[in-house]
Amino acid sequence: MGDRVTERVLSDDASPWFMEHAARYRLAAGYVAGRSVLDVACGTGFGAARLMDAGATRVIGLDIAWDALTTASRLGLRDVGLCRADALSLPVADESVDVVTSFETIEHLRDGQAFIAEVRRVVNQTHGIVILSTPNAYATQPVDNVPKNPYHVREYYPEELTSLLAEHFPSVELKGQVVSRDYGYCPYWVTPASPASTVRQRLSGIGWKLERRLLPDSWKDSVSRLIHRRAFYPSDTDFVFDSSAVEVGHVTVAICKMQG
């Protein structure tokens, strides 16, 4: 297929991207109580377990990578089913799940249209909900539509994502993922090309990267609280999802419903 699927978010809260990823599952948790869930590209399964804890009746996690599923099985995830599967050929019956989640997946696939059609096939056609996320091309700024991330095949501008999803779902709502005003900004998202960054933020981002490289892990939080007055890494609750931040959010989240 020419897809690039080896990029992985591990279940390691020392990673700067872990809590950002976990925040999406926190958002999805508000939609799963009393419902069956399919988590496509579940990785190590930490998010699938969180959805189960949020009251889902059943959660199945699918991923193409054996190493991720092996890690997931070692974690002993309670009541979460795991299966190796291709996102373009889901081993699930038509209309068999209430909610589909799939975070940071579509940018790895050459045929995004086929992926969305497959997701729509398996979700309940009357009350189904699909929650997806993908990097915002306004933030990542691919050159001539070629992503800078070597694992990404295509990155979507919000209007492109809306157009694609609207072909399959009567209701599509986009939200930009940003850090809360209380936290300030997320330094590892600040790059010289970032449209939302100021000179001060860029300089702080450079300083943060130096601190990350040079400071022992045991010092990072203390030094960050002293200098920046916040934890070194944002927690999942430091991220918010705002419909007014679609163009500036580093990540776009789409909430698609079969009922308008």
Where are these regions (language model features)?
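Short, glycine-/aromatic-enriched active-site segment of Class I SAM-dependent methyltransferases
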Residues: 132-154, 158
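Feature marks short, surface-exposed loop/turn motifs that line or immediately flank catalytic pockets
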Residues: 68, 138-140, 181-182
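A short His-aromatic
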Residues: 104-108
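A short glycine-rich, Lys/Arg-flanked "PGG" loop and its adjoining helix->strand segment in the class I
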Residues: 113-128
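Conserved N-terminal segment of class I S-adenosyl-L-methionine
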Residues: 1-93, 99, 103, 113-116, ...
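Flexible, glycine-/basic-rich loop-and-beta segments that form/coincide
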Residues: 190-222
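Substrate-binding/catalytic lobe of Class I Rossmann-like enzymes that use SAM or dcSAM, i.e.
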Residues: 167-199
